[in-house]
């Protein structure tokens, strides 16, 4: 969908730009013809033709060129708006948040193929990044947890991570990041648990609701809140197994990144499908510019003014 809109903007900008150039050429011709003082009826005829050209339908279209051009430049190279469709980044980002993504955070990229034209900064640990999924090309948003060369270990029961930086096949982790977790506190977020009402027609009803616990995760000096569900774990076979590595341990390859959602038990991320190549990065999420009170697949019921601002 995003690529379709980009192609539409590019095509519209090009088409209206051509009409805009033609229109201005005709205006210039008209200006010089009007300056000429001649008794030749041909001049009058030419002026009439030019006046008719000015009233042509394409002149109305050509007037849209500046708008298409500005929107295309801003959206492709400066800031692009995105909507948060799911709860995988709760509590940092909620369903109904509309965010701005800084497109030039990690370089200037060609808007259609996403190939880097000018390379700039590299992603930092803790950045919230929009990227293309490495397999299905869908836009995702997650937090950068692992950088190239990191060894990531995930504790499936305690819901905690260990990170060894600049790992080069050593048996013991010599450069381990200092990671701490606060005591879990009950949050206002909950997940509905469904029970089959009838196995014949597969009707469902709400059986119970489990509230998430909020934990502050601090990686060196970077801290953010995450959500966990006590007593609920994914099957170990659901996790991505890197070639030559045991389950739940990954070594981040060169020019790739390990992404995780802040809603740890409701996020399909690098733990399940692997690493994100650098060329798939679209930009860094920086601000919430609008936030609607809504649930997934439902209409908004209000506006969350207090959520508008910077993203951390």
Swiss-Prot record:
* Active site (UniProt): 88, 142
Q: Which residues lie on this side of the membrane: Cytoplasmic?
A: 28-63
Q: Which CDD domains match?
A: S26_SPase_I
Which keywords does this Swiss-Prot/TrEMBL entry list? Cell membrane, Hydrolase, Membrane, Protease, Transmembrane, Transmembrane helix
- Extracellular side, ranges: 85-312
PROSITE patterns the record matches: SPASE_I_1, SPASE_I_2, SPASE_I_3
Membrane topology according to the record: Multi-pass membrane protein
Gene3D superfamilies, from UniProt?
Answer: 2.170.230.10, Umud Fragment, subunit A
What GO biological process, any one, is recorded here? signal peptide processing
Q: Where are the transmembrane segments?
A: 7-27, 64-84
Q: Which domain of life is it from?
A: Bacteria
Q: Which reaction does it catalyse?
A: Cleavage of hydrophobic, N-terminal signal or leader sequences from secreted and periplasmic proteins
Enzyme Commission designation: 3.4.21.89
- Give the UniProt entry's GO cellular component terms: plasma membrane
State the similarity comment: Belongs to the peptidase S26 family.
Q: What is this protein called?
A: Signal peptidase I
Native organism is Buchnera aphidicola subsp. Schizaphis graminum (strain Sg)
């Amino acid at each position: 969908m995003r690529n379709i809109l980009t192609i539409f903007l590019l095509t519209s900008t090009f088409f209206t730009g051509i009409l805009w150039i033609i229109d201005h050429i005709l205006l210039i011709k008209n200006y010089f013809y009007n300056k000429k003082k001649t008794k030749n009826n041909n001049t009058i005829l030419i002026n009439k033709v030019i006046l008719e050209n000015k009233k042509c339908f394409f002149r109305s279209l050509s007037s849209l060129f500046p708008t298409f051009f500005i929107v295309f430049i801003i959206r492709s190279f400066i800031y692009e708006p995105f909507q948060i469709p799911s709860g995988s980044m709760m509590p940092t980002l909620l369903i109904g948040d509309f965010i701005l993504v800084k497109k030039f955070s990690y370089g200037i990229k060609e808007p259609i193929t996403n190939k880097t034209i000018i390379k700039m900064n590299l992603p930092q640990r803790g950045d919230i990044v929009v990227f293309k999924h490495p397999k299905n090309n869908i836009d995702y948003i997650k937090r950068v947890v692992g950088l190239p060369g990191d060894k990531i270990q995930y504790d499936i029961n305690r819901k905690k991570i260990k990170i060894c930086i600049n790992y080069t096949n050593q048996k013991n982790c010599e450069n381990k990041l200092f990671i701490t977790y606060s005591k879990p506190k009950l949050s206002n977020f909950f997940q509905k648990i469904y029970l089959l009402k009838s196995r014949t027609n597969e009707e469902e009803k709400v059986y119970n609701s489990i509230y998430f616990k909020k934990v502050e995760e601090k990686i060196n000096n970077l801290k953010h809140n995450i959500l966990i569900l006590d007593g609920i774990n994914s099957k170990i076979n659901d996790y991505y197994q890197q070639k030559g590595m045991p389950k739940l341990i990954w070594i981040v390859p060169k020019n790739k990144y390990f992404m995780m959602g802040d809603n740890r038990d409701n996020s399909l991320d690098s733990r399940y499908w692997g690493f994100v190549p650098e060329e798939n990065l679209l930009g860094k999420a920086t601000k919430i510019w609008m936030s609607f009170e809504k649930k997934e697949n439902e209409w908004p019921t209000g506006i969350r003014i207090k959520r508008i601002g910077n993203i951390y």
